């Protein structure tokens, strides 16, 4: 039998280097040069000099971790969370909140220059968030620590699968302030709860939910004990077995209201909603203002979810067609249209990664295109849609790289980037949300 030689991977030498940081990338990492390659440096800011250790050395770039700041930026601040240096949830607490937005905007501009060949962007004022307690949903991990011989409830460590035990998360909604200690105590006191793999948190306007995912059956007696502790915190419990379905029909449907827009959105606990409630409302108002619909437009809203944009725009448009690949979200969008007495919006379930030429909504007489894709972007639909039929395209992005890439396609189809603005949906993280408005030349 022939043996195939496989070279042993050499361990990386722990080099300590002095690096001069010249810029920040779109993940919130400092950028330096080392050995004629770009080096991405965590916990480093532009115009700083740091001592760092190389943690990955690739063919075209390297990665490093700062362990000492030799010359600090004027915008460097002390992190406000006790877990910041271990937890992987936030990446930018060491940077002043206002400057975070500035650096993110610079990073997006560079991506547009690189991928879309656009070097002058008409930046609008960013949509800002409060600095703390902005998350209305989160996912917590639960894992057994062999060394400590106990279960931990917390977040994943930065760059690791291990769990950081958390006392309190200052970016999480205050209604869940005690969730870590309450469940840490419960799970460690009752061995039957060691089958809990994670907790999902979701805050509605009137109810706060904790979904408990478990891999083995849990007795009703234990469930009652957990329910009692949850009731003291005003949390609604939902138990989820290995099945992916989150069954909560026995509880009132969660919802969020957009009072300024006069809308109410119900959602299932397995549906996607925006994490930051205040920025979501500001984002929808901005979309309404930027599009400035006059009442005779036909709007196509792709990746529409539960109707977040569709129903807002339906109030000003002639018709809105929403398309979404998740059936439960389409059902909620249809229900939300009915709840809000909106009759000019219809919703279709369709996998937008597939060919769309046979879809019932394809090639309609449409004026406005709204895109709100996942991080993979909208390239699949942009390459298939007859874009020239649209007068306006509104693109809402959660990944600036795919936005810049897709903007090149939109520009080549005869559109001009009219406006662009950041939405600081996730302060203190490397995540960048952007809204861009394109108009046909």
Swiss-Prot record:
> Where would one find the signal peptide in this protein?
none
Q: What is its EC number?
A: 2.1.1.190
Locate the residues binding [4Fe-4S] cluster.
81, 87, 90, 169
Taking the record's annotation, the residue ranges forming a coiled coil are none
Boundaries of each TRAM domain copy? 10-68
Q: Which UniProt keywords apply?
A: 4Fe-4S, Iron, Iron-sulfur, Metal-binding, Methyltransferase, rRNA processing, S-adenosyl-L-methionine, Transferase
A GO molecular-function term, please? RNA binding
**Pfam families in the record, alphabetically?**
TRAM (PF01938), tRNA_U5-meth_tr (PF05958)
The entry's active site is 398
- Per the record, what are the reactions this protein catalyses? uridine(1939) in 23S rRNA + S-adenosyl-L-methionine = 5-methyluridine(1939) in 23S rRNA + S-adenosyl-L-homocysteine + H(+)
One Gene Ontology term from the biological process aspect of the record: rRNA base methylation
Positions of S-adenosyl-L-methionine binding? 274, 303, 308, 324, 351, 372
Checking PANTHER family in the record gives: 23S RRNA (URACIL(1939)-C(5))-METHYLTRANSFERASE RLMD, RNA M5U METHYLTRANSFERASE
Q: Which purpose does this protein serve, as stated in its record?
A: Catalyzes the formation of 5-methyl-uridine at position 1939 (m5U1939) in 23S rRNA.
Question: In which family does this protein belong, per the annotation?
Answer: Belongs to the class I-like SAM-binding methyltransferase superfamily. RNA M5U methyltransferase family. RlmD subfamily.
Protein's UniProt name: 23S rRNA (uracil(1939)-C(5))-methyltransferase RlmD
Organism name: Pseudoalteromonas translucida (strain TAC 125)
């Amino acid at each position: 039998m022939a043996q195939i030689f496989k070279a042993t991977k050499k361990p990386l030498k722990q080099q300590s280097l002095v690096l001069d940081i010249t810029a920040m990338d779109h993940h919130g990492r400092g950028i330096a040069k080392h050995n004629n390659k770009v080096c991405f440096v965590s916990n480093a800011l532009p115009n700083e000099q740091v001592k760092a250790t190389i943690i990955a050395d690739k063919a075209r770039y390297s990665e490093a971790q700062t362990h000492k700041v030799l010359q600090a930026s004027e915008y460097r601040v002390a992190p406000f969370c006790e877990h910041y240096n271990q937890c992987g949830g936030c990446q930018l607490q060491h940077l002043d909140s206002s400057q975070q937005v500035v650096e993110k905007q610079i990073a997006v501009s560079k991506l547009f220059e690189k991928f879309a060949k656009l070097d002058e962007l008409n930046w609008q004022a960013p949509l800002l968030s409060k600095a703390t307690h902005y998350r209305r949903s989160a996912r917590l991990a639960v894992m057994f620590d062999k060394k400590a011989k106990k279960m931990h409830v917390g977040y994943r460590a930065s760059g690791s699968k291990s769990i950081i035990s958390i006392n309190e998360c200052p970016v999480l909604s205050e209604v869940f302030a005690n969730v870590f200690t309450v469940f840490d105590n419960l799970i460690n006191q009752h061995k039957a709860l060691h089958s809990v793999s994670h907790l999902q948190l979701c805050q509605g306007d009137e109810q706060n939910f904790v979904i408990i995912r478990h891999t083995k059956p849990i007795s009703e007696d234990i469930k009652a004990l957990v329910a009692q502790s949850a009731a003291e915190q005003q949390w609604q419990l939902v138990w989820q077995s290995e099945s992916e379905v989150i069954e909560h029909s026995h509880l009132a449907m969660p919802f969020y209201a957009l009072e300024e827009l006069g809308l109410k959105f119900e959602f299932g606990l397995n549906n996607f909603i925006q994490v930051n409630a205040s920025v979501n409302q500001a984002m929808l108002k901005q979309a309404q203002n930027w599009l400035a619909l006059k009442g005779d437009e036909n709007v196509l809203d792709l990746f529409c979810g539960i109707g977040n944009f569709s129903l807002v725009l339906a109030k000003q448009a002639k018709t809105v067609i929403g398309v979404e690949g998740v059936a439960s979200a389409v059902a909620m969008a249809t229900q939300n249209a009915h709840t809000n007495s909106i009759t000019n919006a219809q919703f279709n379930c369709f996998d937008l990664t597939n060919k769309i030429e046979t879809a019932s909504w394809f090639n309609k007489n449409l004026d406005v295109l709204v895109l709100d894709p996942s991080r993979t972007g909208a390239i699949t639909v942009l390459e298939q849609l007859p874009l020239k039929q649209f007068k306006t395209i509104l693109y809402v992005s959660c990944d600036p790289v795919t936005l810049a890439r897709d903007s090149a396609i939109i520009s080549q189809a005869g559109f001009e980037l009219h406006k662009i603005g950041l939405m600081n949906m996730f302060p203190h993280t490397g995540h960048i949300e952007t809204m861009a408005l394109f108009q046909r030349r």
